Amino acid sequence: MSMVQTVDNVALLPAYLAAGTAVLVLLADLLVARARVTISVAALGALATAAGAVLVGGGGERRTFCVGADCSYVFGGRAALVAVLVALLTLGVLGLSGPLLRAGATPVGEYCFLLAASMTGGVALGAAGDLITLIVALETLTLPLYVLVGLRRGSLASIEAAVTFFVVSVVATTLTLLGAALLYATTGALHLGRLGALFAERPELLDIPLTTVAVALVVVGLTVKVAAVPFHAWAPTTYDGAPLPVAAYLSTVSKLGGVVALLAVVQHALPAQITGLVLALLAVLTMTVGNLVALRQRRTVRLLAWSSVAQAGYILAPLGALALAAGRTGDARAAAYAAAVAYTVFFVVLELAAFAAVVALRPAGADGGTLDELRGAARRRPWAAVGLALALVGLAGLPPGLAGLFAKVTVVRSLLDGGAAGLALVVAVNAVLGLAYYLRVVAALWSTDRPAVIPTDPTAVPTDPAAAATGPAVGSIDPSVALVRAKPVAVVLAAATVVALVVGFAPQLVLDLAAR
């Protein structure tokens, strides 16, 4: 067998575009030094990356870095879907970042560069064909986030959140790398397909205690990335301490990366006899604990964080069924895989819409505030309140949020087809439990108990020349750092809402892509 690797630069085009975006952002910040130009370069780079992924993915599966039949980078339908999602979510987060960057507490060049660098890891992650490529891509996605979380000047909460996130992520990465090393020691393979074939051909490998330890370490390390219970404690603290756009990125792109990595190893590499029961148990714990703790939350972002934990449980459930269905029909396994991918797509779109609405309801650069501050918000900013309500109703799985409804139906159906009726019942019970806190927030938006604690609209710039010359009066809100200007956030919120409605009325679009 030849040890010379083949290289297909077309397969690498989306990754090239993402990495090139990061370089161009640095050059724009250095040479032009205008925030608008830097942000525009990052946004155009994200669009180019998405377009490149569609172009390459539409031409069939492409493999590169191959030695014999084993390839380290495989760009096909799933990789294209992941790359497009990562690029468009990055574009959406850039749209939400305008008020944060205008507030002046966060350097624009560094912020956009870190987002582009993280996007590069996400684009490469979906195409990873071996454990090392997968881990490196996942860390390329995650490493810039440590800095992004703590990049806001003068914020102790951001620094604490960054340290928490860093420590937990380093431990998770260490466990994953150790598990990969032990797997190599027991099997002599790192490529995902080769690992799966070895475990199928040589079942005696499963009797080696070191194999069980290795698989457990890899699974634990990756479940930390999706904030699965009991490895979830970092998520609420990190989300609440991070700037709102960064919290949105953590809740969407970072979560997507963890799910993609976990799905890759469960579907192709790790033995179902070990991973199936572990993932099913983690799914039950994650969705139950996430929903129960979310009921007690009084801060907006913490509620969304715990909701994200619960949603991770719904995603893990079909992954557990996928492994448990190893001895069942190929259709059952395919349904479980498609359900996990489809649910993740529905979730990240709705989550982006929810964070966009919260950004629209908060002062520039502020945190998410408390639920009490959302009371009566529909009277002042009805478009943002409607967007938040639709997103939360969708996450709850109720009409008109049909995306969330079909996501949960898809998960339950895949569990039933895979013979995991008990797990399907737990999902159904938790879906009902989640209604309580989602609908509580929706009701608060239209509450008349007290006016919403929301500053004045920043677009209402004083027209009095004297007022403009002397600046804002004492106790008033400076328009440059008050509520977000409606346009960029409204575009992101409207786009996310429209996408959620489209896939809600035509879920087969996502299911067909997920099944590729």
From Swiss-Prot:
Belongs to the complex I subunit 2 family. It is found in: Cell membrane. NDH-1 is composed of 14 different subunits. Subunits NuoA, H, J, K, L, M, N constitute the membrane sector of the complex. It is an enzyme of class 7 (translocase). One of its GO terms (molecular function) is NADH dehydrogenase (ubiquinone) activity. The gene is nuoN. This is NADH-quinone oxidoreductase subunit N. GO terms for cellular component: plasma membrane. Its main location: membrane. InterPro entries: NADH-Q_OxRdtase_suN/2, ND/Mrp_TM. Keywords: Cell membrane, Membrane, NAD, Quinone, Translocase, Transmembrane, Transmembrane helix, Transport. Pfam families: Proton_antipo_M.
